[in-house]
C-alpha cells in the first residue's frame, strides 16, 4: 500500500498543457461561517480568491428572494430584513437524519427556519412554502457554484476541478453529502481533504527545507466557528522507491469537539444582549420573540466578541432593534468569559484525546500551532497555554487561510496540468470500520447454533488510501454481511447520538451456491470481498468473488522444482464470469513498499499483529489482507447502497 503522494513546487509550477484556457484548479475551504477559495493557474502558483467586495473570505450565507439568489455579504444584509429566507450554518445538517440531536439543537437555536422531514431519505428539508423546499445538500451546492463563479472571475478562465475541505470527523454519510452537493454544482471533485490535513500540508510545504530524517512532532489546535479539532502531525524525510528522499507528514493523533466554536460564544452573547434589552424595559414585548431582532443581535454579538479579543470592554449598539427602539449596552470581556465558562472548560479535552490516540506525551510535541478564527479569543489561548505547558503558542501560519492553501496545493498535485515536487501525505481515518456476519456452527453435542463474528477492516487512525480484502472461508451458499463502524467507545454519549447509525450497509450475496455447484471439481480458496478507502476517506466495496483452484500434474522432468501448478478461477457474483487473478486484481497480501521511517508506526505494528493472527482468523471463517496500491487506483466498480 502506497501512501497518498501530494506534490507541490513552492516557487514554480510547470504547466504541462499548451492549452491555458481551462487548466486552472481551485480549492474551497467551506467552514460553517466563512468560505475561503484558492486557485492555481498558469503564472499564479497559489492565490486566495477575492470576492466581489475584494475580501479574502466570504460569509457562508444564501438568501432566496423570489427569483433572486443572494450570497455572502448581500445575503447577510437580507438576514436582518427577512431571516426566514436567509440560510446559514446548514452544513451542520448534512447527512443527518431528522431525529438527530444536531437537528433538534439547530431548530432551537434558529427558530426562524421551518424544518420538515424528507420522508424518502429520512433527512431534513428547509421549507419555504407549501411547494418549495431545499435540502442542505442543495444549499451547499448553491454555495459551491457561487464559489466557482468567484474563482472563474478571478482566474479569468473556466474552473471545474476542485479540492474541498471537510472536517476530519465527518463520517461516511456526511462526506457523501458533500460530494452530492458538488455534483449538483457540476464541479469535478478531485478529492475531499480533511481540513486539519490541509493545514498540516500548508505548514509543511513552506518548511520543506527544515524537514529531515529526524522526526518533528507538531500539534495543530484549530477552533473555528462551529467545532474544534486538535491534530498531532509528524514531519520527516523518508526514502521513496522512485524519488529518493522526500518530505512526509503523517497524522498521528486526532481529538475533536463538534460543538465547541465561535458560534457558541456568539449565541450566548446574543442571548445576553437580549436579556439586557428586556431589562431596559423600553418595550412591553419580549425581544426574544422577534426573529428579526434576534438576527440583528446575533450579528452584533459576533462583532462585539471580535472586538473584545483586543479590548477589555466595548459598547454594543443597534439602531432600531425593535419597534424603532435603539439598543445600547456596555459589555466587558469578563462578562463574555463568564457567559462561556462551560465552553472554556472544554478547551483542553481535544488536546488530551489527540495525545491519547497518538499514544504520545506532551513532552514529545515540539510546537503547538494555532489555527482558526476562534483561537484569537484571549481566554482560549490562556487555557491552551496552560494545558500544553509550552512557553508560547505558534502563530506563524495564517489561521484563516491555511486550510484553503493546503487544499489548493493538493489540487495542483492531482491536476494533470501541473508538475510539482513530491510531498507525501499519510492521512488517517478517525473512525474504525469492521465487517460483521453470522454463520452456523456445530457444537460438541452435534447441535447447531449461530455464531456472530466481527472482523476489523480499518483500525482507528488507519492510514488511507488503502485497499483491504476480507476472505470468507466457510460459506458455500448465499449469505450476507454488514459493514459497520467499529468500537467508538472513545466518543462521549452525546457524540455517539450525533454520530447516528453505526451500520453503513448490509451486503447480500446471491449466486454463491450456484457458483460452487458449477465448480465442484475445484478446490475453494474462499469468497473474497475487496474494499477500497480512497483519498477522500470514502469506503467502497469494489467487488466480491469466489476463488477456486485446480491442481494440474506437470511433466516428470519438472517435478523436482514444481510439482503442482495452481490455476485460480474467480467467479464474480452477478456476472458469473471467470477472471484469472493477475497483478492488477491480486487479492493476496502484498508487502508494502519501504516509504516510511525505519521506526514502525502504530498502524504497521498492528498490521504485523494481524498477520500473526491470520490462522486464528481463518478458524473464525474470515481473513483480512491489504491489497497493493498499483499506481493510480482502479475506478470504483460498485458502491454499497445504504439501507
Curated annotation (Swiss-Prot):
One of its GO terms (cellular component) is endoplasmic reticulum lumen. The keyword ATP-binding applies. Has a pivotal role in cytoprotective cellular mechanisms triggered by oxygen deprivation. May play a role as a molecular chaperone and participate in protein folding. It is found in: Endoplasmic reticulum lumen. One of its GO terms (molecular function) is ATP binding. It comes from the Eukaryota. CDD domains: ASKHA_NBD_HSP70_HYOU1. The gene is hyou1. It holds the Pfam family HSP70. Residues 565-643 are annotated as: Disordered. Residues 590-610 have a biased composition (Acidic residues). Its main location: endoplasmic reticulum. This is Hypoxia up-regulated protein 1. Keywords: ATP-binding, Chaperone, Endoplasmic reticulum, Nucleotide-binding, Signal. The lineage of its organism: Eukaryota, Metazoa, Chordata, Craniata, Vertebrata. Belongs to the heat shock protein 70 family. Residues 611-621, 630-643 have a biased composition (Basic and acidic residues). Residues 1-22 form the signal peptide. InterPro entries: ATPase_NBD, Heat_shock_70_CS, HSP70_peptide-bd_sf, Hsp_70_fam.
Amino acid at each position: 500500500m502506497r501512501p497518498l503522494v501530494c506534490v507541490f513546487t513552492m516557487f514554480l509550477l510547470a504547466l504541462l498543457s499548451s492549452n491555458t484556457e481551462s487548466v486552472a484548479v481551485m480549492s474551497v475551504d467551506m467552514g460553517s461561517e466563512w468560505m475561503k477559495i484558492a486557485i492555481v493557474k498558469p503564472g499564479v502558483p497559489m492565490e486566495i480568491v477575492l470576492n466581489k467586495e475584494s475580501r479574502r473570505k466570504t460569509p457562508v450565507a444564501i438568501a432566496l428572494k423570489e427569483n433572486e439568489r443572494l450570497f455572502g455579504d448581500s445575503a447577510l444584509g437580507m438576514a436582518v430584513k427577512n431571516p426566514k429566507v436567509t440560510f446559514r450554518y446548514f452544513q451542520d445538517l448534512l447527512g443527518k437524519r431528522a431525529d438527530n440531536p444536531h437537528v433538534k439543537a439547530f431548530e432551537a437555536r434558529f427558530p426562524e427556519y421551518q424544518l420538515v422531514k424528507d420522508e424518502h431519505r429520512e433527512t431534513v428539508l428547509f421549507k419555504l412554502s407549501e411547494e418549495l423546499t431545499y435540502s442542505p445538500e442543495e444549499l451547499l451546492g448553491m454555495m459551491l457554484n457561487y464559489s466557482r463563479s468567484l474563482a472563474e472571475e478571478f482566474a479569468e478562465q473556466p474552473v471545474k476541478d476542485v479540492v474541498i475541505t471537510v472536517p476530519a470527523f465527518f463520517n461516511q454519510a456526511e462526506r457523501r453529502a458533500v460530494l452530492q452537493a458538488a455534483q449538483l454544482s457540476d464541479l469535478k471533485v478531485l478529492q475531499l481533504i480533511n481540513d486539519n490535513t490541509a493545514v498540516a500540508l500548508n505548514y509543511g510545504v513552506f518548511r520543506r527545507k527544515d524537514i529531515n530524517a529526524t522526526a518533528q512532532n507538531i500539534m495543530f489546535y484549530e477552533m473555528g466557528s462551529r467545532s474544534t479539532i486538535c491534530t498531532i502531525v509528524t514531519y520527516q524525510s523518508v526514502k521513496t522507491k522512485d524519488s529518493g528522499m522526500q518530505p512526509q507528514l503523517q497524522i498521528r493523533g486526532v481529538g475533536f469537539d463538534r460543538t465547541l466554536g465561535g458560534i457558541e460564544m456568539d449565541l450566548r452573547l446574543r442571548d445576553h444582549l437580549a436579556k439586557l434589552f428586556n431589562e431596559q424595559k423600553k418595550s412591553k414585548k419580549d425581544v426574544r420573540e422577534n426573529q428579526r431582532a434576534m438576527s440583528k443581535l446575533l450579528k452584533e454579538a459576533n462583532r462585539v466578541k471580535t472586538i473584545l479579543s483586543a479590548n477589555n470592554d466595548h459598547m454594543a449598539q443597534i439602531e432600531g432593534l425593535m419597534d424603532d427602539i435603539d439598543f445600547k449596552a456596555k459589555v466587558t470581556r469578563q462578562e463574555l468569559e463568564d457567559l462561556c465558562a462551560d465552553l472554556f472548560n472544554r478547551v483542553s479535552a481535544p488536546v488530551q484525546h489527540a495525545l491519547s490516540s497518538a499514544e504520545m506525551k506532551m513532552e514529545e510535541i515540539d510546537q503547538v500551532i494555532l489555527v482558526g478564527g476562534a483561537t484569537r479569543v484571549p481566554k482560549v489561548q490562556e487555557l491552551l497555554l496552560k494545558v500544553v505547558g509550552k512557553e508560547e503558542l505558534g502563530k506563524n501560519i495564517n489561521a484563516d487561510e491555511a486550510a484553503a492553501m493546503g487544499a489548493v496545493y493538493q489540487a495542483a498535485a492531482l491536476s494533470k496540468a501541473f508538475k510539482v515536487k513530491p510531498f507525501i501525505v499519510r492521512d488517517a481515518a478517525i473512525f474504525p470500520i469492521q465487517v460483521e456476519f453470522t454463520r452456523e456452527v456445530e457444537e460438541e453435542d452435534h447441535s447447531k447454533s449461530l455464531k456472530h463474528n466481527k472482523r476489523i477492516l480499518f483500525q482507528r487512525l488507519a492510514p488511507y488510501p488503502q485497499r483491504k480484502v476480507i476472505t470468507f472461508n466457510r460459506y458455500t451458499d448465499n449469505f450476507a454481511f454488514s459493514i459497520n463502524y467499529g468500537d467508538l467507545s472513545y466518543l462521549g454519549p452525546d457524540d455517539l447520538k450525533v454520530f447516528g447509525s453505526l451500520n453503513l450497509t448490509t451486503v447480500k450475496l446471491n449466486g454463491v451456491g450456484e457458483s460452487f455447484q458449477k465448480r465442484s471439481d475445484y478446490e475453494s480458496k474462499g469468497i473474497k470481498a475487496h474494499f477500497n478507502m480512497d483519498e477522500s476517506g470514502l469506503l467502497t466495496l469494489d467487488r466480491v468473488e469466489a476463488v477456486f483452484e485446480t491442481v494440474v500434474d506437470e511433466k516428470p522432468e519438472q517435478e523436482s522444482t514444481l510439482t503442482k501448478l495452481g490455476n485460480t478461477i474467480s467467479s464474480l457474483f452477478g456476472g458469473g464470469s471467470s477472471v484469472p487473478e493477475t497483478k492488477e486484481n491480486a487479492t493476496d497480501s502484498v508487502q508494502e513498499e519501504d516509504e516510511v521511517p525505519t521506526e514502525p508506526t502504530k498502524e504497521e505494528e498492528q498490521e504485523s499483529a494481524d498477520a500473526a493472527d491470520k490462522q486464528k482468523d481463518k478458524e473464525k471463517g474470515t481473513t483480512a489482507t491489504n491489497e497493493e496500491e498499483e499506481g493510480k487506483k482502479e475506478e470504483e466498480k460498485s458502491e454499497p447502497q445504504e439501507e
